[in-house]
């Protein structure tokens, strides 16, 4: 009486393991880039939150306000989970049209948020510097930013 074999041969199993290994070799770096991009996007959210503070400070003719909390000021920075956004720059009173820089900047430093060591190694310690325009929009400053271009949110690239 013949016995029927059921299951996979060793060669078939080795081929499946090799295919999974090849797929993982491509998927893991792509996933790491995805995580870094999503963490870098938090910086833009923090910068948007600082727009109101910058507008308030501009009424007194400066980008940065009094950083003394006792005076009722909200301060010049905002801390998120992965980044710290800080208002910087000197107000340009001559800027009038919407496409001119008003002199104010937001410096976003990754790795100084509340998450501590849980930030992607691809962006930790990097800076994204955003110039603010008269109309309130931001554009990244190519000369002062050391964050890789692929991690900079598209909203500030144009």
Swiss-Prot record:
PROSITE patterns documented for this protein: PROKAR_NTER_METHYL
Disulfide-bonded cysteines: 63-104
Annotated keywords: Disulfide bond, Fimbrium, Membrane, Methylation, Transmembrane, Transmembrane helix
Pfam families: N_methyl (PF07963), Pilin (PF00114)
Annotated propeptide span(s): 1-7
InterPro entries: N_methyl_site, Pilin, Pilin-like, T4P/T2SS_Core
Cellular component GO terms held in the UniProt record: membrane; pilus
Chain positions with N-methylphenylalanine modification: 8
Topology within the bilayer: Single-pass membrane protein
Top-level taxon of origin: Bacteria
Transmembrane segments: 8-28
GO biological process: cell adhesion
Subcellular location: Fimbrium; Membrane
Assembly and binders: The pili are polar flexible filaments of about 5.4 nanometers diameter and 2.5 micrometers average length; they consist of only a single polypeptide chain arranged in a helical configuration of five subunits per turn in the assembled pilus.
Similarity comment: family membership: Belongs to the N-Me-Phe pilin family.
Purpose: Major component of the type IV fimbriae that plays an essential role in twitching motility, natural transformation, and protease secretion.
Protein name as catalogued: Type IV major fimbrial protein FimA
Species of provenance: Dichelobacter nodosus
Gene name, Swiss-Prot/TrEMBL: fimA
């Amino acid at each position: 009486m013949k016995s029927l074999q059921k299951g996979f041969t060793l060669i078939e199993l080795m081929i499946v393991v090799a295919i999974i290994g090849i797929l993982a070799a491509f998927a893991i770096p792509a996933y790491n880039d995805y995580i870094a991009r999503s963490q870098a996007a938090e910086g833009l959210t923090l910068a948007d939150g600082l727009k109101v503070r910058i507008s308030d400070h501009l009424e007194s003719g400066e980008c940065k306000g009094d950083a003394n909390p006792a005076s009722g000021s909200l301060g010049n920075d905002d801390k998120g989970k992965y980044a710290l956004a800080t208002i910087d720059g000197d107000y340009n009173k001559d800027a009038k049209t919407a496409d001119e820089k008003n002199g104010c900047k937001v410096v976003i430093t990754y790795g100084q948020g509340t998450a501590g060591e849980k930030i992607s190694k691809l962006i930790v310690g990097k800076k994204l510097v955003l110039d603010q325009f008269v109309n309130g929009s931001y554009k990244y400053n190519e000369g002062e930013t050391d964050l890789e271009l692929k991690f900079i949110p598209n909203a500030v690239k144009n």
